[in-house]
From Swiss-Prot:
Residues 1-26 form the signal peptide. Adult and fetal liver. The keyword Cell inner membrane does not apply. It comes from Mus musculus. This is Apolipoprotein C-I. GO terms for molecular function: fatty acid binding; phospholipase inhibitor activity. Inhibitor of lipoprotein binding to the low density lipoprotein (LDL) receptor, LDL receptor-related protein, and very low density lipoprotein (VLDL) receptor. Associates with high density lipoproteins (HDL) and the triacylglycerol-rich lipoproteins in the plasma and makes up about 10% of the protein of the VLDL and 2% of that of HDL. Appears to interfere directly with fatty acid uptake and is also the major plasma inhibitor of cholesteryl ester transfer protein (CETP). GO terms for cellular component: endoplasmic reticulum; extracellular region; high-density lipoprotein particle; very-low-density lipoprotein particle. The gene is Apoc1. It is found in: Secreted. The keyword Transmembrane helix does not apply.
Length: 88
């Protein structure tokens, strides 16, 4: 009984294996892939730009980050003034 079930299953598996990949699984055409690369790179660049702009806006709007930025600007100004007076 097991042989009657196993043999057709084995035949189906071998037939599927020898048939090759389905059209959706087949390797894509190289020229089609090369043609789509610029579009994908442009899309990636636009997405990256949007995310970077959103992150910068988010940083600008945070209160603690605004205070930190002001403190760094003030400290940099003091160091700049100190160097200016020292080397003048």
């Amino acid at each position: 009984m097991r042989l009657f079930i196993a043999l057709p299953v084995l035949i189906v598996v071998v037939a599927m294996t020898l048939e090759g990949p389905a059209p959706a699984q087949a390797a894509p055409d190289l020229s089609g892939t090369l043609e789509s690369i610029p579009d994908k790179l442009k899309e990636f660049g636009n997405t990256l730009e949007d995310k970077a702009r959103a992150a910068i806006e988010h940083i600008k709007q945070k209160e603690i980050l605004t205070k930190t930025r002001a403190w760094f600007s003030e400290a940099f100004g003091k160091v700049k003034e100190k160097l200016k007076t020292t080397f003048s």
